[in-house]
């Protein structure tokens, strides 16, 4: 339903549809993968009852910053996306949106996001500057390092410490266990994503963990996912989370095991579906956290 409504813009206002595609609003998977961990942290920080204003701020912030991240990513990759099958029709490549328009749109999205952060507190505002730096630098990392997925993981996890400081005014050391857990998980699922482009990336000289890991890619992904669950288990113990949370982790572990089995032949589309499937793992963990606080 959501995607059908958005696609109707293509007929009503093709220009607006170009910007929908630029921000990937027609592909909300990135919103989910960024949203669930942010909500994990917000619910834990609020001990099951985070403030409504913070929920609104962080949900809107996730949507806006993810959109901005897509814009700056496409701007950075505008000269190479035409050589990759999956990205050759993006608006900046086709010329439907100019480089200048993309940069202005990125600035607008980040400006609105910053206005939302101003509704929190000084510590959260300062932390947001680090998140902006990570989001803006990530698209350029693939040119210089085989670890762009690590930078993405750092950026995708940055909302978690911000959620703690916004909700409590404090940042306990254990919150960084959640941060590390999400970073490891992100590197894992984004490696599946990078595996879909690996052949094209090798031709044009773009680097990724999928290339770095080589034949060990799936084993390393599963290891990263397992370490992520260990970090979450340790953090859960410190935050006194119990059975429902553990059930959420068990469901996530089942998701990871299925992805490992499903991608056994490393088919490009299967790797992409495994990437998409991680949304369910994040949701399962969030439901476990919510239920654990709700049924006490």
Swiss-Prot record:
Organism for this UniProt entry: Pseudomonas fluorescens (strain SBW25)
UniProt topology in membrane: Multi-pass membrane protein
Annotated catalysed reactions: all-trans-octaprenyl diphosphate + 4-hydroxybenzoate = 4-hydroxy-3-(all-trans-octaprenyl)benzoate + diphosphate
GO-annotated biological processes: ubiquinone biosynthetic process
Record-listed E.C. numbers: 2.5.1.39
Organism phylogeny: Bacteria, Pseudomonadati, Pseudomonadota, Gammaproteobacteria, Pseudomonadales
Family assignment from sequence similarity: Belongs to the UbiA prenyltransferase family.
Top enzyme class: transferase
Gene3D superfamilies the record matches: UbiA prenyltransferase
UniProt protein name: 4-hydroxybenzoate octaprenyltransferase
UniProt-annotated location(s): Cell inner membrane
Pfam families: UbiA
């Amino acid at each position: 339903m959501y995607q059908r409504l958005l696609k109707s813009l293509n007929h009503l206002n093709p220009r607006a549809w170009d910007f929908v595609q630029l921000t990937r609003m027609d592909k909300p998977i990135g919103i989910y993968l960024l949203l669930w961990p942010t909500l994990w942290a917000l619910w834990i920080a609020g001990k099951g009852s985070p403030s409504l204003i913070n929920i609104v701020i962080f949900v809107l912030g996730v949507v806006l910053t993810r959109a901005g991240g897509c814009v700056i990513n496409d701007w950075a990759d505008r000269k190479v996306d035409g050589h990759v099958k999956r990205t050759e029709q993006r608006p900046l490549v086709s010329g439907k949106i100019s480089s200048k328009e993309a940069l202005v749109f990125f600035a607008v999205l980040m400006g609105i996001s910053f206005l939302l952060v101003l509704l929190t507190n000084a510590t959260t505002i300062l932390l947001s500057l680090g998140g902006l730096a990570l989001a803006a630098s990530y698209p350029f990392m693939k040119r210089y390092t085989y670890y762009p997925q690590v930078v993405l993981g750092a950026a995708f996890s940055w909302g978690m410490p911000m959620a703690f400081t916004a909700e409590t005014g404090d940042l306990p050391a254990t919150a960084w266990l959640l941060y590390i857990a999400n970073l490891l998980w992100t590197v894992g699922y984004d490696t599946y994503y990078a595996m879909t482009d690996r052949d094209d990336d090798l031709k044009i000289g773009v680097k990724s963990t999928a290339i770095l890991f080589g034949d060990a890619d799936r084993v390393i992904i599963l290891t990263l996912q397992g370490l992520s669950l260990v970090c979450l288990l340790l953090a859960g113990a410190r935050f006194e989370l119990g059975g429902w949370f553990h059930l959420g982790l068990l469901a996530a572990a089942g998701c990871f095991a299925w992805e490992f089995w499903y991608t056994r032949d490393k088919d490009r589309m299967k790797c992409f579906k495994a990437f998409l499937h991680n949304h369910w793992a994040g949701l399962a963990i969030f439901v476990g956290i919510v239920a654990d606080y709700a049924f006490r």
